[in-house]
Structures are given as structure tokens and as C-alpha cells.
Design a protein with these regions (language model features):
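Bacterial Sec-exported substrate-binding components of ABC uptake systems
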Residues: 2, 23-63, 179-213, 342-371
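Bacterial N-terminal signal peptides that target proteins for export
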Residues: 2-14
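Bacterial N-terminal signal peptides
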Residues: 12-23
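Short helix-initiation/N-cap motifs at beta->coil->alpha
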Residues: 36, 101-113, 248-257
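A short, structured surface patch at a secondary-structure boundary
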Residues: 58-119, 124, 128-133
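Extracytoplasmic ligand-binding site segments that recognize negatively charged/polar headgroups
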Residues: 78-86, 129-139, 154-167, 203-230
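Structured C-terminal subdomain patch of bacterial secreted/periplasmic proteins
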Residues: 105, 159-173, 277-371
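Alpha-helical, coiled-coil/dimerization segments enriched in small aliphatic residues
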Residues: 223-250
Length: 371
């Protein structure tokens, strides 16, 4: 019987050669993207076991894995069920497996367990750079990467206009859904360009003062608002002046009732998604949304504001702040801030275009006017 005999040196050389060839094979099939933090993220195959750092990040997957945005998700946080129950109920009816989808946390970064994530054996973790889930500053991300699990950071929250493109492109590449990602981004940028072109013609003194109150009725005190990032940056992008940014140093903060009354804003917008605040989102009717906004504007603290007195208050679905669908918020806010410049902009028609890309469309009242 013929036996192949190799010296220890030749055996080591052969093993090194095999390892090198295996590395070349992996590299040949590897996918690499740059995330919103400028990090290079590489996977050696299209991920099939995804963990979402926040449940509401699934909105991006809905545009990519259109038939079933949960087909690759093996774990997520419980934030959508807790913080946007209307949307959760709509998707749970379409995808009953959501009730059994493993939870990695509830609705905070502190509640997320790295051990629970590792037990799910994911091949990709998708985290946001701010919010209710693990961020780049979280030890969870470090632990996963040390365990060999790629972590992709996306962002629709901090710099929504700038980072929606980067986030969707990266997801489209890693998931093998480049065509779907580009289809949505083409729509997004076409609609955004109309806003940008008109805002660019405005003079510096043509920026109405806007007070955006986040989750009034749900938040423990009146005056919770945004600084220069997030929806605050959207106010500036549509040609408004965010009065919150003048005094809130960070992303979010509370302003006093006295400050708001003295600032005398021209536009009042309240965000909401659940009781006892402004009811907006999936399955919510116009009548319900308008009645809930009326309760919020009747609060004695801000009832004296000019836009509220004039019946020109507005309500906006809160979850636009962390969603690729933020183009709808951009268009709605543009019409509220500069109605004379954006008469022909129709966010309802834009939502119809987006719904053509979704198996479960956006069906409900996502913005509302006081009258």
C-alpha cells in the first residue's frame, strides 16, 4: 500500500498553503461595505441570520426583503411592540412568527444581552448609532466583533438626510438587494431634490420659527424637543428655524414653557404614535388622529401659541425619526413650514409610490393638521 510521507517542514508548508488558498476563496466571495461610521464591514456570505439592535430598524428590511422582511431576522428588541404598538399589530397579523421571535432586550441599550445574541448564532448584527439599542459605544458591539460576528452601524436618526443613502446602500449590498435599495434611493433623492432646490432660493429672513414637541402627552413634562440633529435637522432642511436648537446642546432636551411662549413660534408640530399622546401611524384614522391632536393642543401650557390659536397645529408620526421613510416627514414638514412654496408637494402620493415597494404598505394616518 502506497503511503505519502511528508517531513514536518513540508507538512507545515502544505497546511499554510491550504490556509492561504482558503483565505483567497473566502475573499473572492466576501462582501465589503463602508458603514455610516466609516468602518469597513466584511461578510464572507450574504447574511441569513440577522440580529436587529432595535426592532424598528426592520423598516429598512421591509424595502429590501420585500416578500418577508423577517425571513432572515433571528432576534430583535421589543421596542416596536412597546413603543409603537399599532405598527407591531399590523405586522404581527401578516407575519405571526413575530410573536415567537427571540428578544435580545426590551427597549433600551442596557437591556440588551450579548449572551442572548451570541446564543442565536447570528452572521450579522445591525445596530444604530443612537437610540434604544446598542451603539458604537456599547460593549455589546465589541463583544460580538471579538466573537467574529460582523456589526453594521446604520443611521436614520442622528443625520437622517445624509445617512439614509449610506445605510440603504450598505444594507442592499450585504443582503444582495442592491436593486431594491437603489430603487428606493432613486425615489428618495428625486423627492429630496425638489425640496432642496426651492429651499436654496429662500432668503435668510424667510425661515419661520418652528417648535417641534416630541411625544407630548407621553413624555413626562411639556417641552421635550430636539436640538440640531434628527428631526431638528429636517426643520432646517425644509427652510425653517428650529427654536429648540437655540438652547438644546445635544440631540434631545427639554425647554421651558416660558421659553417657548417667549420665542413665539410660527409653526407648532407634535410627534406621536400612541396614547395618551397624538395617535398616528398604522391603522389610525384621520378622525382619531385629529381628535388626539386636539387634546394635546388644548393643554394650558401651549394653548396660547399663535399657530395653535389659529388652528394651524400639526401632528407627525414619531417613528419617522428613525426610519428610511423620513422623506414623508420631510415633505409634510416642508408644506407646513412653507405652504406657499410647496403647494404641489403631495406626501400622500409619495407614500403611494413607497407602498408599491412594500408588501405591507403604510396604511393609516401618518401626519395630521388641526383642521
Amino acid at each position: 500500500m502506497y503511503r505519502l510521507c511528508l517531513s514536518p517542514q513540508r507538512l507545515l508548508l502544505a497546511l499554510l498553503l491550504l490556509a492561504a488558498l482558503a483565505g483567497v476563496a473566502r475573499t473572492a466571495h466576501a462582501l465589503e461595505v463602508t458603514d455610516v461610521l466609516g468602518r469597513k464591514v466584511e461578510v464572507d456570505h450574504s447574511p441569513q441570520r440577522i440580529v436587529l439592535g432595535e426592532g424598528r430598524l426592520f423598516f429598512a428590511l421591509a424595502l429590501l426583503d420585500r416578500d418577508n422582511p423577517f425571513q432572515r431576522v433571528v432576534g430583535w428588541q421589543n421596542d416596536m411592540r412597546l413603543l409603537d404598538p399599532h405598527t407591531y399589530e399590523v405586522y404581527a397579523k401578516q407575519y405571526p412568527q413575530l410573536a415567537k421571535l427571540p428578544l435580545i432586550g426590551q427597549a433600551s441599550e442596557q437591556s440588551v444581552s450579548a449572551e442572548q445574541i451570541l446564543a442565536l448564532k447570528p452572521d450579522l448584527a445591525i445596530f444604530s448609532i443612537a437610540g434604544e439599542g446598542p451603539t458604537q459605544h456599547s460593549p455589546v458591539a465589541d463583544l460580538l466583533e471579538k466573537a467574529g460576528i460582523p456589526v453594521l452601524f446604520i443611521d436614520f436618526r442622528v443625520h437622517p438626510i445624509r445617512n439614509t443613502r449610506v445605510s440603504m446602500q450598505a444594507l442592499g449590498t450585504l443582503l444582495g438587494r442592491e436593486q431594491q435599495a437603489q430603487a428606493y434611493l432613486s425615489l428618495y433623492e428625486r423627492h429630496l431634490a425638489r425640496i432642496n432646490e426651492r429651499v436654496a432660493t429662500l432668503a435668510a429672513d424667510q425661515r419661520p420659527k418652528v417648535f417641534l414637541e416630541l411625544l407630548p402627552g407621553v413624555w413626562q413634562a411639556p417641552g421635550h424637543t430636539t436640538g440640531k440633529s434628527g428631526l431638528g435637522s429636517v426643520i432646517e432642511a425644509v427652510g425653517g428655524h428650529n427654536i429648540g436648537a437655540d438652547v438644546v446642546p445635544g440631540a434631545l432636551g427639554d425647554v421651558s414653557v416660558e421659553y417657548v411662549l417667549q420665542a413665539d413660534p410660527d409653526v407648532y408640530i407634535a410627534t406621536g404614535n400612541r396614547a395618551p399622546g397624538v395617535l398616528l401611524g398604522a391603522g389610525v384614522s384621520l378622525e382619531t388622529a385629529r381628535q388626539s391632536l386636539a387634546k394635546i393642543t388644548a393643554r394650558p401650557e401651549f394653548a396660547p401659541l399663535r399657530p395653535i390659536q389659529a388652528g394651524q397645529a400639526h401632528g407627525l408620526w414619531h417613528d419617522f425619526y428613525n426610519s428610511p421613510f423620513n422623506i414623508l416627514a420631510i415633505e409634510a414638514m416642508a408644506k407646513w413650514v412653507h405652504p406657499e412654496h410647496f403647494k404641489d408637494i403631495d406626501p400622500q402620493a409619495t407614500m403611494g409610490e413607497i407602498n408599491q415597494m412594500l408588501k405591507v404598505g403604510l396604511d393609516g394616518q401618518y401626519w395630521v393638521n388641526a383642521k
